[in-house]
Amino acid sequence: MKTKLLSKIICNVLAVIVGLLTVGGAIANANASAINSFLGVSTQKVINTGTSTPVNFYDTQYKSVDELRAASEAINEKTLEEGMVLLKNDNNALPLSAGASVSLYSANSVTFVYAGSGSSSNLTENVTANAVNLKDGLTAAGLSVNEGLWNWYMANDQYWQGSVVTDKNGNKYSTVSGNRKQGATFVTKDAPWSALPTDATNQAEAAILVVSRNGGENADFAMNTKSAGMTSGDYLSLGDNERDVLTNLKRLKEAGTIGKIVVLINSANQLECDFADNPDYGVDAVLWVGVVGSTGTNAIGRVLTGAVNPSGRLADTYFYQNTANPVYDTDGNMEYDNADILPNAKNSHGYIVYKEGIYNGYRYTETRYEDYVLGQGNAGEYEYAQTVSYPFGYGLSYTTFATRLDGVERFVNKDNSVTYNVTATVTN
């Protein structure tokens, strides 16, 4: 009996000791640096062998931070020059003539999107606060920007989308971002035409409407939730006031007050492009510029004036209506059950089921159209031309070409290849 009691006591004591050692060990490991410092214990020893070992694995070619920054800005602008996509250019609306007068419309013109969300958002505030704004970028390219309209948009921040931030120097800018859950509120309020000053009706060679949207990791869109300030559509379609401005710009164009209407798409997301060919708006040119970085607006000016020929191609399929995109069905504000019990700092609790698999974008549109034409699969009725506004890989250029077929050579070999000899000539 005594033996059993003694064994039980020993087991209990050992259990307590093991528990203390486990917990104590974890605490000690977590605070090892502080404990070693307090006890004066060093866990490392530097042995100098007398040999010289290079400490820089990648030697810099720049002599200062300023020189490094200038080089990175040059790369940024070169990337924009080669990446911008000319989607529409009726009657050679672009490039604009040297010294052309332009008016910038939409609050987005003064709250341009320079950086994205998620991993790139760490420096968004710094990039945005120090970026070259659109007016300065166009002015540097020789364009004459309507100062009165620009200043009005700058002063009326109640029409800005996103949060208005004032930096230490008193400069205001906007940050457009969501929160750590799907369905973040995105606003496309902008200013209606009736609120604009008389400067909006100034004579100009071109009216440039800026459409900015921003989202991504940590700032997901919920397509089934209308954006604040919109009576129809969603955040990736034009808002009511943006459409109102376009309608009135067409009126000014018909009256001869402005020469042409240009739309800049300032977004990395797939905007609905139903507006581009809508006769109610009279849009002459559409230029996709993406998210431009700190100095990308300089490149926009050079493309608009023809100093640089746009040669980019779309990396996505753009739809007239995003409801025709199969991923639309899986977008929304889906949350894990009981996710609200998590601390706010860890409430990334949204999820999406990618039930469309790889069949999104061009993989979906091209496959379904092929099946429809060939009468195979389960394609149903499908009108490609009424669904896709701009396909994957699309992009125009200011350059025009004439081609001539010089001959055809057929080779009888294992790959049964055919060679076409074609002469291409630049005509402008």
For every predicted segment, state its role.
Residues 1-428:
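C-terminal non-catalytic regions of proteins with extracellular/luminal or membrane-system context
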